[in-house]
């Protein structure tokens, strides 16, 4: 019985876990990488797509579902188990991803054609997404179903977004039973939009997310007060544009609800709200159709005659022409994706407004390393959009309490529910600092816990009630490879002062394998940084190439520019291949 971490290990995106039981392979999530790791989307899967028998999807967000069409393109034909809202949202998100990737590939192919280079292929096309949709198998919360011989699962409400799930897996192999819980993305214990995460107490292993494993959020009341105070000041000025980059699933609906509460107090009435996301409009309709799965607060607001996700002041934007026309508005609120500003319509809105000191940019969600949003939040004085350098003069605000992720306190509270069975925690879905911090806190509470590493494989063993996993492994007759939990999570030498001879004598096979994995991981990251730097150089040279094509550069310089273009593309191609 094996578990392999194929993504979201010491990083927030790219969730992908492989479970092998009785010779059958089951994937949990298959998400896209975003930010500085997005080049990994092009890399081959660490398993044959046609060898996977089934997929369990925790929720629709693209960092959990975005590579499923690629998996289907490469041969996956098993069922994809998910809740109905997750299925409906994923279909919307995949269609939008196809559009964005096709547009990007078309732009890059046109550029390549001018240089005599081959066209660029998108990660997947519409036919791949459509084929993936046919594999969906809807499941109900709390119902136990068998997904392969000896493996049954139960989806539980995770309270993260509409339809999000934790997944309980009961795996039986050779009369040995192991209980594994995948947390997915956990919502806050006290949430505004969704129901609180379901309570689970029984497990041998728990994969726990750690997005905010080292941070606390403001509570709902403090967050609401902060947002309302800021918006009141902006409304009183009546001369500003407010740009809110937002995830168009769940976060956009939450912001529209908060604006509705303000209008109910007579604040901000008449100030237009431009919801510039056709995909977000579709998602909002799904939220309205599944109101019974949302929080008591939202349902109560609706029962009392309110519309939590819209009013006459909210204008839904569909076409590009309508989107561009918003730039002519002197004041108003613009809600648009993507939430990290690494694509979508928010990019052209920022290009047209971030240079104006009267305007405001309000970030209401997590900004991953390597994204435009992260650069702005970190204080960049200038940013580059479509090859143009733009000064950042608008006022920048960050309100963290809107997060649909559990914070450190909530994560530990959720983990404490497992105290009756004392499982081993495998920390995933967090940057290194956050993941390490959460693992340390779990160990302080008496749990066995370690941070998962990319491409790490562990063997899963059953245990007696109250027995630690490390004790169960001592008694297990399982083969020494792949590494056990005890090896994978072995602590570093606390003294740090052993002689070279002592180090040689005490190094264990698991530690050597772990060092090799770390070296490979650092090499991959260094390569991705190199690729990103080369892409930045290519982006900065785009203006020069455009000037050359329009005749603004001398004929003598043209051959040199062509040579540089070919060289850059060649280096980038080789770097991505590596």
What are these regions (language model features)?
Residues 9-14, 21-134, 186-195, 378-386, ...:
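Pre-active-site segment of Zn-dependent metallo-hydrolases
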Residues 97-161, 291-329:
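Metallo-beta-lactamase
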Residues 159-164, 170-203, 209-211, 216-218, ...:
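Active-site-proximal loop/helix segments of hydrolase catalytic cores
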Residues 186, 219-224, 310-321, 340-342, ...:
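A general structural motif
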């Amino acid at each position: 019985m094996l578990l392999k971490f194929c993504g979201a290990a010491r990083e927030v995106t790219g969730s992908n876990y492989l479970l092998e039981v009785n010779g059958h392979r089951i994937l949990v999530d298959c998400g896209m990488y975003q930010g500085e790791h997005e080049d990994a989307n092009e890399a081959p899967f660490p398993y044959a797509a046609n060898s996977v028998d089934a997929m369990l999807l925790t929720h629709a967000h693209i960092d959990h579902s975005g590579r499923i069409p690629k998996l289907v393109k490469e041969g996956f034909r098993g069922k994809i188990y998910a809740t109905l809202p997750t299925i409906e949202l994923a279909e919307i998100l995949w269609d939008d991803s196809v559009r964005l990737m096709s547009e990007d590939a078309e732009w890059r192919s046109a550029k390549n054609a001018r240089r005599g280079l081959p066209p660029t292929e998108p990660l997947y096309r519409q036919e791949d997404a459509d084929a993936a949709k046919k594999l969906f198998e809807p499941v109900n919360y709390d119902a136990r179903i068998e997904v392969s011989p000896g493996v049954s699962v139960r989806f539980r409400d995770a309270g993260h977004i509409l339809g999000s799930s934790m997944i309980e897996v009961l795996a039986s192999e050779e009369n040995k039973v192991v209980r594994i819980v995948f947390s997915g993305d956990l919502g806050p214990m006290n949430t505004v939009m969704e129901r609180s995460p379901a309570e689970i107490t029984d497990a041998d292993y728990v994969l726990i997310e750690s997005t905010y494993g080292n941070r606390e959020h403001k509570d709902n009341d403090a967050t609401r007060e902060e947002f309302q105070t800021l918006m009141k000041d902006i409304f009183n000025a009546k001369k500003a544009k407010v740009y809110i980059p937002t995830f168009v699933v769940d976060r956009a609906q939450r912001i529209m609800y908060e604006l509705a509460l303000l209008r109910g107090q007579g604040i901000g009435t008449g100030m237009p709200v431009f919801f510039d996301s056709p995909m977000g409009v579709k998602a909002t309709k799904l939220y309205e159709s599944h109101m019974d799965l949302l929080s008591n607060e939202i349902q109560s607001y609706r029962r009392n005659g309110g519309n939590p996700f819209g009013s006459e002041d909210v204008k839904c934007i569909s076409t590009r022409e309508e989107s561009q026309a918003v730039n002519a508005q002197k004041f108003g609120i613009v809600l648009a994706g993507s939430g990290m500003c690494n694509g979508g319509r928010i990019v052209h809105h920022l290009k047209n407004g971030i240079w104006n000191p009267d305007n405001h940019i309000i970030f209401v969600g997590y900004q991953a390393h390597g994204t435009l949003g992260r650069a702005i939040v970190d204080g960049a004085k200038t940013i580059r959009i479509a090859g143009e350098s733009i000064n950042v003069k608008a006022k920048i605000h960050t309100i963290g309490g809107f997060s649909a992720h559990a914070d450190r306190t909530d994560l530990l509270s959720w983990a404490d529910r497992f105290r009756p069975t004392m499982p081993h925690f495998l920390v995933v879905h967090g940057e290194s600092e956050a993941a390490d911090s959460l693992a340390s806190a779990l160990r302080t509470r008496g749990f066995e816990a370690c941070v998962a590493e990319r491409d790490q494989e562990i063997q899963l063993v059953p245990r007696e009630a109250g027995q630690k996993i490390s004790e169960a492994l001592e008694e297990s007759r399982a083969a020494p490879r792949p590494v056990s939990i005890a090896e994978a999570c072995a602590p570093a030498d606390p003294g740090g002062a052993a002689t070279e001879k002592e180090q040689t004598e005490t190094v264990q096979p698991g530690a050597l394998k772990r060092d090799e994995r770390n070296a490979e991981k650092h090499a991959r990251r260094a390569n991705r940084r190199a690729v990103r730097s080369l892409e930045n150089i290519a982006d900065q040279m785009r203006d020069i190439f455009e000037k050359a094509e329009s005749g603004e550069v001398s004929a003598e310089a043209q051959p040199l520019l062509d040579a540089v273009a070919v060289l850059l593309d060649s280096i980038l191609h080789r770097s991505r291949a590596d």
